[in-house]
Swiss-Prot record:
Gene3D superfamilies: 3.30.160.430. It comes from Neurospora crassa (strain ATCC 24698 / 74-OR23-1A / CBS 708.71 / DSM 1257 / FGSC 987). One of its GO terms (biological process) is chromosome segregation. One of its GO terms (cellular component) is spindle pole body. The lineage of its organism: Eukaryota, Fungi, Dikarya, Ascomycota, Pezizomycotina. Acts as a component of the essential kinetochore-associated NDC80 complex, which is required for chromosome segregation and spindle checkpoint activity. The gene is kpr-3. Pfam families: Spc24. It is found in: Nucleus; Chromosome, Centromere, Kinetochore; Cytoplasm, Cytoskeleton, Microtubule organizing center, Spindle pole body. Residues 126-153 are annotated as: Disordered. PANTHER family: KINETOCHORE PROTEIN SPC24, PTHR22142. Belongs to the SPC24 family. This is Probable kinetochore protein spc24.
Amino acid sequence: MLLEEDPSTLIAHTTQNFNITPDRHAVSRVAESLSTLQQARDLRLRESETNLKKLARTLNTLQSQHQEVTSSHSSAEHASLISRLDTQKFRVAKNVSDLEMETERLQTQLAELQARLQELELQGVDGGDASAAGGATSTGENNGNGSAGNGGQVRSVEDEVLLRLKVYRSLGIEIEREEQDGGEFTRAVVRNDRRGDVCVVNVDRHRFSRFFYANYFWQTL
């Protein structure tokens, strides 16, 4: 039996029957896996720390910039600036409107002065007196001609008026006559088909000359 055998012999046989090589290989593989995992973990940890430091620096930079912007541009100053700029904008717009109105007034005055200048140039230095004298002379000479000559002159005047009215209509100007003014032409309707405008002008010979109205009609057309 077992007790009768030599213990050393039993131990030797037991040792020979044990096969621990596969276990040792398994333990080695587990140790290598643990080492690889530890290295990978350390690498990811270092990368995470590096990214965290970068994000921290970016955050500090953005916070500094935000503080600078906030300190240099307060909401009260911004509102005050906007209000001041709005006031300046309205003031400039009003000045522009006033200047446009003044320009229109000066243009009208310039047209009146130009018309007056043309009238004076056409009349000449003694034009008014000469025309008056000529009119008086022709009146004296025509007093003895008789009713036949007067009738021919009336027809000639009517033909001239009709011709003028026809010319005006061809230009887009309608001349109207009012009965309460003694049958004189006192109103002109100027139509500009190109712009689609209609302008009504009250003709007052005592206020403006015919040259002024002629220039005004041309400018309107």
